[in-house]
């Protein structure tokens, strides 16, 4: 198993996924360890200068003017973690919680947070030994960062809260335990937080970045899969390949459109079905937009997803706590890097971009099941009337598309003041992340439905064969889901194709 060396500078989104899914380990890079030592030394030095330093020997937020006696500084950090662990709702799924731990460790590895080596080592040991904090999804407004989610992470470090014990490679369901018990079972001991450490752990954008990163990576795969689903539908509807010609795309110059059209051309190369309806005998002049404009719509989605990738690629290596500790200049400086606006905006774009993959997919399903549009039996049903075929599969897709329209209302346009007016503009970044995650999940199901329905259409076009790559995907789908010869409970078929999507088994 690959071991990633965290340095706060070079972590990639794909590496985040690898650690989140248990496919890679993480350790602290030697150079990062030295930076951590130096930043901690500066914090310790400032403790001796008699001055007020925010979050080190003062209260927090609107209580920043309150000086805390030296004897109470450890208690101050513990109280910060306890008081901020006010999250509610379902716990983050294990991959997202692991990504959260990884991202917080990577940020601390930059050496500008003032954390001790010992505390950072415990965080990485938890990741290594499968101690995964129970982190409620809700309760963050995205500034000062994701306070509540990160506080729930920090609870486990101090032997409080709850954790799943899920050692990498272990079989069975993870065990949910009190945090201290989970540490003990993993052979670890809780830490007593020193001045600045509680603040270094709870202040940052890592929850929204963790959820958003995994949603983004899934959306990227779905953008490619949308081309396959669209190509399969196009073949089933005897659609034209001509709108995907490179000169059309070059005349507009949008990079996502150019990439999507190239992918569609590759998927559709060598199609017998296409050859069967070319030439002067073809009665079609133009296909519906949901077929003809796939490069433009899928391409715009790709461009939006790419924008989100750029933001998150920077954010996973960003120092987003406050104050920041700069040992090279000897300064500890308060700022606003905890504000999640860049991530919130990017995740709203991700949701809107991905939603269009489902919206146009559902319209293609309508083309397939509507006999006046497809020339195929109504709802692709055998003995239609007695059988309803894929009638309600299209309705399910429509329901998810409409749900996405609600979810795509941007979270980042909202703000609500908190902390007695001190935190008077917030990002709602975690809300954007959770919404984007659900939108992407809905897109996956809509594409699974389209693939299922398009496969039936291809069956009905036999003996003519589709393009080779479309035929290969059709064959893989048919290994799991048989042709619909009479009505059956379609939810099982939708679930089976959705699993194929998750496994990457249909990826072109």
UniProtKB/Swiss-Prot annotation:
Contains an active site 4-methylidene-imidazol-5-one (MIO), which is formed autocatalytically by cyclization and dehydration of residues Ala-Ser-Gly. CDD domains: PAL-HAL (cd00332). Transmembrane segments: none annotated. Keywords: Cytoplasm, Histidine metabolism, Lyase. Its EC number is 4.3.1.3. It is an enzyme of class 4 (lyase). Its main location: cytoplasm. It catalyses: L-histidine = trans-urocanate + NH4(+). One of its GO terms (molecular function) is histidine ammonia-lyase activity. There is a cross-link at residues 143-145 (5-imidazolinone (Ala-Gly)). Belongs to the PAL/histidase family. This is Histidine ammonia-lyase. It comes from Anaeromyxobacter dehalogenans (strain 2CP-1 / ATCC BAA-258). The gene is hutH.
């Amino acid at each position: 198993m690959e071991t990633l060396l965290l340095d706060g500078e070079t972590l990639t989104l794909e590496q985040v996924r690898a650690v989140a899914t248990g496919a890679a380990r993480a350790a602290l890079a030697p150079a990062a360890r030295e930076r951590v030592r130096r930043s901690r030394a500066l914090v310790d030095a400032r403790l001796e200068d008699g001055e007020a330093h925010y979050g080190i020997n003062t209260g927090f937020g609107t209580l920043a003017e309150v000086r805390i006696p030296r004897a109470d500084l450890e208690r101050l950090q513990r109280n910060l973690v306890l008081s901020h662990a006010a999250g509610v709702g379902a716990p983050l799924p294990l991959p997202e919680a692991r990504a959260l731990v990884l991202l917080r460790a990577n940020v601390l590895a930059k050496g500008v947070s003032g954390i001790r080596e010992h505390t950072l080592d415990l965080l990485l040991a938890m990741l290594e030994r499968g101690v995964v904090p129970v982190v409620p999804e809700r309760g963050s407004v995205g500034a000062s960062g994701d306070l509540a989610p990160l506080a729930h992470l920090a609870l486990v470090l101090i032997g409080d809260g709850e954790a799943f014990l899920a050692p990498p490679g272990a079989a069975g369901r993870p065990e949910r335990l009190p945090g201290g018990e989970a540490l003990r079972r993993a052979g670890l001991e809780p830490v007593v937080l020193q001045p600045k450490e509680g603040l270094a752990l709870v202040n940052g954008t890592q929850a929204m970045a963790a959820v958003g990163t995994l949603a983004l990576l899934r959306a990227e795969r779905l953008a490619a899969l949308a081309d396959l689903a669209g190509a399969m539908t196009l073949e089933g509807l005897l659609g034209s390949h001509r709108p995907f010609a490179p000169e059309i795309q070059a005349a507009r110059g949008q990079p996502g459109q150019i990439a999507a059209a190239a992918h569609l051309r590759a998927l559709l190369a060598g199609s017998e079905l296409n050859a069967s309806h070319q030439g002067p005998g073809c009665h079609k002049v133009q296909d519906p937009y949901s077929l003809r404009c796939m490069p433009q719509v899928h391409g715009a989605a790709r461009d939006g997803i790419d924008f989100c990738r750029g933001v998150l690629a920077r954010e996973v290596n960003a120092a987003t706590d406050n104050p920041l500790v700069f040992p090279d200049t000897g300064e500890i400086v308060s700022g606003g890097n905890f504000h999640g606006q860049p991530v919130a905006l990017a995740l709203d774009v991700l949701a809107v971009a991905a939603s269009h993959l489902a919206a146009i997919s559902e319209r293609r399903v309508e083309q397939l099941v509507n006999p006046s549009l497809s020339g195929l039996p109504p709802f692709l049903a055998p003995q239609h009337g007695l059988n309803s075929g894929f009638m309600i599969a299209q309705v399910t897709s429509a329901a998810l598309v409409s749900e996405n329209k609600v979810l795509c209302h941007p979270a980042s346009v909202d703000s609500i003041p908190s902390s007695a007016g001190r935190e008077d503009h917030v990002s709602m970044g975690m809300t954007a992340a959770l919404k984007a995650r659900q939108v992407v999940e809905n897109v996956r199901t809509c594409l699974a439905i389209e693939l299922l329905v398009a496969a039936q259409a291809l069956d009905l076009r036999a003996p003519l064969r589709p393009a080779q790559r479309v035929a290969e995907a059709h064959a893989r789908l048919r290994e799991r889901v048989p042709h619909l010869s009479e009505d059956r409970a379609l939810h099982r078929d939708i679930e089976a194709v959705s699993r194929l999507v998750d496994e990457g088994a249909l990826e072109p």
